[in-house]
Amino acid sequence: MIDAGIYVHVPYCRRKCLYCDFFSGGYKTADWEGFVRCIINEYNERRGEISGKADTLYIGGGTPSLMPDTPFRSLLRFLIDNISWGIGKREISLEVNPEDVSEEKARMWKREGVNRVSMGVQSFNDDELMRVGRRHDSRRAIEAYDVLRKHLDNISIDLMFGLPGQTVESWEKSVETAVTLNPEHISAYSLMLEEGTPMTVLAEKGRIELPDDRLNDEMWRRLSVRLSESGYRQYEISNYSKQGYESKHNGKYWRQVPYLGLGPSAHSYDGDRERRFNPPDITGYLKRFGSGQEGREPFYRREMLTDEEIKEEYILTRMRVSEGINLSDFRERFGKAAEERLLHNLMTLPNQELVENKEGNISLSSDGIMVADSVILALAM
């Protein structure tokens, strides 16, 4: 049995980035001790939902690197002491922003058990950072990386392409800076205009100019070539790593592995057919778990997946990773009729060069990755 993962959502930010639709609230009024107490109470109430062991803990947000030292230590020490860990190496990840990194914090994070950090850089171009509402500049990002490198040997950098005013040349410079820093892992995401975000409003009003699809495709191509030349392997559509440094935790989301999500807006999955969603409600969360009284109504909302939904999710997530879908495993899970339907969908794709079928594994080709959403949806029909 594959070990589960634990996710903790820290819902506080200094200021929301213009493109972000993740759930978060202002940090100035945050009751950090109360929040940590609620996470502990929720874990104690729900720990039985994970029947086996866990081998990953991911603290994301929001901006968890905002958390002061004392409540952070309390949270991490409790979780490390109380999670039923598997026998393999633990991966304990923390999302950080460059402006929060200091020698003292990095030393404390490492001392308390963090062994992987994911730093949201997005760009090494100061104009691009300003346009999307980031608080750091490129120099601060590089300084933060250098500090983290003194204390940690597993660092991931997040980059974004398709930003307002971004060019292929400025993107190449950001990628080159990231490669020069030599992190173990690089994630690269295309800017998505999410409904209701300030970035979407600005775009709809014509106040910002975004790169078109042709430029976005060229940025992705140049990224992939440069990272491949530098020893990074693309193991998922948006993720590249040095050998052995793939994100163990995120891999659980793509491979139908159970995980428990704690905190407002966090979601969980039992590895079979049940998903649970915590509402995006900080006040309600603090009220529900502040007292530590068990036996009340669950805070989360349940969703039971149908057989068809389970199959569709399997296709949608497995086709994101480099190994793709193993046909033997697919047939064992869903039956021969489902396999024949998948193969029929594969054979009727307008362009057969978008998907590779090698030794019983179906995966996206490099051209297929460029149009991944449409290809994967066609296979899942």
Spans of model-derived segments:
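Immediate flanking context of iron-sulfur cluster ligation sites
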Residues: I2-V10
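A short, conserved structural fragment
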Residues: P350-G360
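C-terminal scaffold of the Radical SAM
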Residues: I2-D3, S24-R46, K53-K336
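Short amphipathic alpha-helical interaction segments
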Residues: K336-T348
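Short, amphipathic alpha-helical interaction segments positioned at domain boundaries
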Residues: I369-M381
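Minor-groove-contacting beta-hairpin "wing" of winged helix-turn-helix DNA-binding domains
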Residues: N361-S365
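Local cysteine-cluster metal-coordination motifs and their immediate loop/turn environment
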Residues: P11-S24
